[in-house]
């Protein structure tokens, strides 16, 4: 019984650490998105993809 409790406690501890690291990584990604240069790069990517999609529709006649 004691080893079962120890195992569950270890799993709980490791799960807590995993959630903490995931939250830190998510926060870091959000900070990068808040960077104006990063936002400009994302907008440029979308603009290029939209332009390519429009050209494809134009040439394919759809």
UniProtKB/Swiss-Prot annotation:
The alphabetized UniProt keywords are:
Amidation, Amphibian defense peptide, Antibiotic, Antimicrobial, Cleavage on pair of basic residues, Cytolysis, Fungicide, Hemolysis, Secreted, Signal
Q: Where in the cell is it found?
A: Secreted
Give the highest taxon in the source lineage.
Eukaryota
One Pfam entry for this protein is: FSAP_sig_propep
Q: What GO terms fall under cellular component here?
A: extracellular region
Return one Gene Ontology term, BP aspect.
Answer: defense response to fungus
Residues bearing Leucine amide are 60
Q: What is the reported tissue distribution?
A: Expressed by the skin glands.
Q: Which residues form the propeptide?
A: 23-44
| Stretch forming the signal peptide | 1-22
Protein task = Has antimicrobial activity against some Gram-positive bacteria and fungi but has no activity against a range of Gram-negative bacteria except P.faecalis. Active against the Gram-positive bacteria S.aureus ATCC 25923 (MIC=37.5 uM), S.carnosus KHS (MIC=37.5 uM), B.licheniformis X39 (MIC=19 uM), R.rhodochrous X15 (MIC=4.8 uM), is virtually inactive against E.faecalis 981 (MIC=150 uM) and inactive against E.faecium 091299. Has some antimicrobial activity against the Gram-negative bacterium P.faecalis X29 (MIC=75 uM) and is inactive against E.coli, P.aeruginosa and S.typhi.
Give the similarity note: Belongs to the frog skin active peptide (FSAP) family. Temporin subfamily.
Q: What name does UniProt use for this protein?
A: Temporin-HN1
């Amino acid at each position: 019984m004691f080893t079962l409790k120890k195992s569950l406690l270890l799993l709980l501890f490791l799960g807590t650490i995993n959630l903490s690291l995931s939250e830190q990584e998510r926060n870091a990604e959000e900070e990068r998105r808040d960077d104006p240069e990063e936002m400009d790069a994302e907008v440029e990517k979308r603009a290029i993809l939209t332009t390519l999609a429009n050209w494809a529709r134009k040439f394919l006649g759809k």
